[in-house]
Amino acid sequence: MFAICDSGWVPVYLRWIYGIDRKQYCGPMIFKDLVAQGKHRMIFMGTNQKTLDSLQKELAKMNPDVMGMTFYELPFKTVDEFDYPAIAKMIEEDNADIVWVALGAPKQDFFMSLLKPHLKRGVMIGVGAAFNFYSGMGEKRAPEWVTRMHLEFIYRIMQSPKKQLKRCWGIVTSLPVMLYQEWRRKNKK
């Protein structure tokens, strides 16, 4: 098993609690690196067809092979309403090594966990807003100085307050308790 420090704060918490030094490697960074490598067959799922079409054109500048890959718009549904066996069959027939899922957190996480039992191969990676960032349609990632200061969440709240405030509130209200519990568990050893 491996874990990737997606949040800018995860490396900070690892350092505070365990003294472990890790760098952030978030979804958009992983996405760009793996697409540019050109070593894997990929399928891109989520968002809307307009964004997917623009994304395909932009990614082809990094990796021309992307033009022959599948970009699939997932219909707007709750996670319980998807036809997971049919989606898995499409992925299997595509022979994708990597399945990129952009439905936003936490929906994409639930989607992937429900799809996983139907897949025989490949790796699924939830990348949230990465499709929007790389589609060239206007949505940008926070400036580098903002991410270095671990304040990207504030930038994202300002970009789409209704969506992000709800998401961030859940994290802000549960994270201190989880961190304290982990700190206590670690110090009992």
How would you name each of these model-derived features?
Residues I91, N95-W100, A105, R121:
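Proline-aspartate-enriched helix->loop->beta-strand connector
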Residues F2, R41, D97-I98, V123:
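Structural motif
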Residues W9, L103-Q108, A130-F131:
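Short glycine-rich anion-binding loops that position phosphate/pyrophosphate groups of nucleotides
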